[in-house]
């Protein structure tokens, strides 16, 4: 009966419209064939592809010539990793290697900029000018013994004052602050900040920084946190906006304009006349820096074949860490914060040459069907790599010639909302990134909170290099884990380690402390005797180190994972979302410092709960190791979720694979060809009387 009603509604089928073009990731039946193979493994067969039924024309025959222009482009051109990249020589082509190296060099400058807050905005020890070093007068904010500038120490029994908790709210950077007591009440402490001028003991190798330049102490301490806040907010907005623009106009223009404007705003920061101007310009500097980070990351991914993507991305991370390790020496060389800021920004001048050296992403041109520009770039690359036309075994160039009349087809990141699987994958990775970078600050603050009891952590350089060394060890471990477990397995392992470290630090140590104070049994008495405060502090530091180690890997791997599973047409937009989520995680540090560490414990508990949710959600992600990058939204939808452990021989999987899925997209065309069906025919066979 349903077939009869369709037949009546459709009439003779002459007025039926062809299937709609691709929208929000859905393809017409005839276009699905062009997208299915790209989700498979590189170099493998098409055993896991969805095999769609051929599309039927309303008259029962093939599509007419008037519909040919709206059909999908050639499958050969969409298979970039399998056809186009091998034709250009892959990563073995000399010009491609040069381009990859050119994406590594700016990572050093980016590392300088990302960690500059630790030096420009470090809050030094200070005392009233004219009070004498180590002398406590009216308004003196810090008491202690002064040797030389690098050896300032404070007696551990010194009570906190309004100024002292204001000046020590950040010992090295926004993520390694010691625990601070609640602000003391008014009264005698009101006289501690009656000074109008101070002398400073800056620990970062500089003679003057932003805090000492404009006396951002006592009642003005909050302006330091706003300055840190402004850079991160600029990064967040930059990731979101430049990501969408890069998907629409291309990676190359965004990279060029971001470089030009970071030179303008970055150098103007060094000429700031007050802290308000400094914070405002830092926002725009962060905005432009985000455009550079995002476009270079996408270009690096799109240049590489499947087997080289991860290692090339990790090399860029190591170069950025080199900038982190070199920053203290650079600060000691400059001695003044304005010179340091100018020296950090000036190397970006070299990136102006990229306009004439670095071409547009060929993968993006092919994915957005800009075949005219793609043809010119392919000819240019073959000339640079000395590739002869005879090596085009698969016939890429002849197919490209046939498609030159196509109009470009660009996509915005909002299209992902209508997809079935892709938006879920991106949301999961955004939450992972937010959790990883957010809880990293909790572990760092917990570790630096024991600096009074661990003399090594009292030194600024010890704090700084401890954090940098943990990040370096995390990246090294990530290389090994991802090699053996893949992207999804590695992310799951590091998230489990993060959750364990967080829960043990929050629960186990508090439980031990409770039992040690009220021993009700012989076992508890032994715990009370054996578990001293120093031992608990050592456990807490150990858990903090493990937590920072694992959470750094979670954040970095989430960003890389998103770059692989997001289709080329919206890759920068997807990267912008996950990087902005990471920025929100890092933003919690200056926000909590701005409120004098209030709500820190709740902050840690919330992120600890998020780690448990993320462990479950990671299992929903596909595995992208050794797979071709998806080129359009339909390719991203074809990424399958495979089990973590391979099936044993003879064991049947419980879930259907892509090869076993059936395509019912042509059923609605049965009514259109109903005139050719015998009487009594149904969708499932012949109707018996």
UniProtKB/Swiss-Prot annotation:
Q: Transmembrane region positions?
A: 229-249, 253-273, 283-303, 310-330, 339-359, 466-486, 489-509, 541-561, 572-592, 601-621
Question: Which regions are flagged for Polar residues bias?
Answer: 165-177
**InterPro entries, per the entry:** MFS_sugar_transport-like (IPR005828), MFS_trans_sf (IPR036259), Sugar_transporter_CS (IPR005829)
Q: Name the Pfam families for this protein.
A: Sugar_tr (PF00083)
Q: Which UniProt keywords apply?
A: Glycoprotein, Ion transport, Membrane, Transmembrane, Transmembrane helix, Transport
Q: Which GO cellular component terms, listed alphabetically, does the Swiss-Prot or TrEMBL entry include? A: membrane
Q: Name one GO molecular function term.
A: transmembrane transporter activity
Q: Specify the superkingdom.
A: Eukaryota
Topological type in the membrane: Multi-pass membrane protein
Q: Name the family the entry cites.
A: Belongs to the major facilitator (TC 2.A.1) superfamily. Organic cation transporter (TC 2.A.1.19) family.
State the name under which the record lists this protein. Solute carrier family 22 member 23
């Amino acid at each position: 009966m349903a077939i009869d009603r369709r037949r009546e509604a459709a009439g003779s089928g002459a007025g039926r419209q062809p299937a709609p073009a691709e929208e929000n990731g859905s393809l017409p039946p005839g276009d699905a064939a062009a997208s299915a193979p790209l989700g498979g493994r590189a170099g493998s067969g098409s055993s896991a592809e969805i095999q769609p039924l051929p599309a039927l024309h309303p008259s029962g025959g093939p599509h007419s010539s008037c519909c040919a222009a709206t059909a999908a482009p050639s499958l050969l051109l969409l298979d970039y990793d399998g056809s186009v990249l091998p034709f250009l020589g892959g990563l073995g082509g000399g010009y491609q290697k040069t381009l990859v190296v050119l994406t590594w060099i700016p990572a050093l400058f980016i590392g300088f900029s990302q960690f500059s807050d630790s030096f420009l905005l470090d809050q030094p020890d200070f005392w009233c000018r004219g009070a004498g070093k180590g002398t406590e007068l009216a308004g003196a904010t810090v008491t202690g013994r002064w040797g030389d500038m690098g050896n300032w120490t404070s007696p551990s029994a010194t009570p906190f004052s309004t100024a002292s908790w204001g000046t020590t709210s950040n010992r090295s950077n926004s993520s390694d602050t010691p625990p601070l007591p609640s602000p003391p009440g008014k009264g005698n402490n009101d006289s501690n900040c009656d000074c109008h001028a101070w002398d400073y003991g800056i620990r970062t190798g500089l003679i003057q920084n932003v805090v000492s330049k404009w006396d951002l102490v006592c009642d003005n301490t909050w302006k330091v946190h706003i300055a840190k806040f402004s850079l991160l907010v600029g990064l967040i907005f930059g990731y979101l906006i430049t990501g969408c623009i890069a998907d629409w106009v291309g990676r190359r223009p965004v990279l060029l304009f971001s470089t030009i404007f970071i030179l303008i705003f970055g150098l103007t920061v060094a000429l700031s006349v007050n802290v308000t101007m400094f914070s405002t310009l830092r926002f725009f500097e962060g905005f432009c820096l985000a455009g550079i980070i995002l476009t270079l990351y996408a270009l690096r991914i799109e240049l590489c074949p499947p087997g080289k993507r991860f290692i090339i991305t990790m090399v860029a991370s190591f170069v950025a860490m080199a900038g982190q390790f070199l920053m203290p020496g650079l600060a000691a060389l400059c001695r003044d914060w304005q010179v340091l800021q100018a020296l950090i920004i000036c190397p970006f001048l070299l990136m102006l040459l990229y306009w004439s050296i670095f071409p547009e992403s060929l993968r993006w041109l092919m994915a957005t069907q800009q075949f005219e520009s793609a043809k010119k770039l392919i000819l240019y690359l073959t000339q640079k790599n000395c590739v002869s036309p005879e090596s085009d075994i698969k016939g890429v160039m002849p197919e490209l010639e046939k498609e030159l009349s196509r109009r470009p087809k660009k996509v915005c990141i909002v299209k992902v909302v209508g997809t079935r699987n892709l938006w879920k994958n991106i949301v999961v990775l955004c939450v992972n990134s937010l959790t990883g970078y957010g809880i990293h600050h909790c572990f760092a603050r917990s570790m630096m909170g024991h600096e009074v009891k661990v003399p090594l952590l009292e030194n600024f350089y010890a704090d700084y290099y401890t954090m940098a060394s943990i990040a370096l060890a995390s990246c090294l471990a990530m290389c090994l884990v991802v090699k053996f477990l893949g992207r999804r397995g590695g992310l799951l392992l590091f998230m489990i380690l993060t959750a364990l470290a967080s829960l043990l630090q929050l629960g186990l140590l508090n439980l031990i402390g409770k039992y040690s104070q009220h021993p009700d049994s012989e076992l508890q008495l032994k715990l009370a005797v054996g578990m001293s405060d120093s031992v608990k502090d050592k456990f807490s530091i150990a858990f903090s180190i493990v937590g920072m180690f694992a959470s750094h890997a979670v954040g970095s791997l989430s960003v890389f994972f998103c770059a692989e599973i997001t289709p080329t047409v919206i890759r920068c937009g997807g990267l912008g979302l996950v990087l902005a989520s990471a920025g929100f995680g890092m933003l919690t540090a200056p926000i909590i410092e701005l409120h004098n560490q209030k709500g820190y414990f709740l902050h840690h508990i919330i992120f600890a709960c998020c780690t448990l949710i993320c462990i479950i959600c990671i299992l929903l992600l596909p595995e992208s190791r050794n797979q071709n990058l998806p080129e359009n939204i339909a390719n991203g939808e074809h990424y399958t979720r495979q089990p973590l452990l391979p099936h044993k021989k003879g064991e049947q999987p419980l879930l259907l694979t892509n090869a076993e899925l059936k395509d019912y997209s042509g059923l609605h065309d049965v009514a259109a060809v109903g005139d050719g069906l015998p009487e009594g025919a149904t969708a499932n066979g012949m109707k018996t009387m």
